[in-house]
């Protein structure tokens, strides 16, 4: 389903366990837009009735049921460079 690099997993868990994040939140992976112009989204959120909740490598992951088939096989990484830091999502 979804794969995390070790550094991405570490950064996500560090964020989710931060005291500023409300209890019960999970990593939301989703899509914005459609067809050829869709882009991936990452965020922290509570589950809704439209979500599936998974635990992947110790990370609680929320995915809207409508997005499931499009997110199979995505890989999430994290990088720090001179120009900034952040997550990348690629489809493998």
Q: What label would you give each PLM region?
A:
Residues 2-5, 20-24, 30-46, 50:
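Short, thiol/selenol-centered motifs that function as redox-active sites or metal-ligating centers
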Residues 7-15:
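Phosphate-interacting basic helix/loop segments used at nucleotide- and nucleic-acid interfaces
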Residues 12, 58, 76:
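Residue-level signature of catalytic and energy-coupling elements of molecular machines
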Residues 14-27, 57:
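Short, low-complexity, intrinsically disordered N-terminal segments
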Residues 17-19, 41-45, 67-68, 77-79:
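Short linear motifs in intrinsically disordered
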Residues 52-56:
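Short acidic-hydrophobic surface loop/beta-edge motif
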Residues 63-92:
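C-terminal structural segments of small proteins and small subunits
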């Amino acid at each position: 389903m979804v794969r995390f690099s070790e550094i991405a997993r570490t950064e996500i868990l560090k964020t989710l366990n931060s005291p500023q994040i409300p209890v019960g939140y999970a990593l939301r992976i989703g899509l914005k837009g459609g067809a050829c112009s869709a882009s991936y989204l990452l965020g922290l959120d509570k589950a809704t009735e439209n979500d599936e909740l998974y635990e992947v490598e110790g990370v609680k992951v929320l995915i809207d049921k409508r997005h499931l088939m499009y997110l199979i096989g995505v890989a999430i990484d994290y990088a720090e460079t001179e120009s900034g830091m952040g997550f990348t999502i690629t489809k493998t």
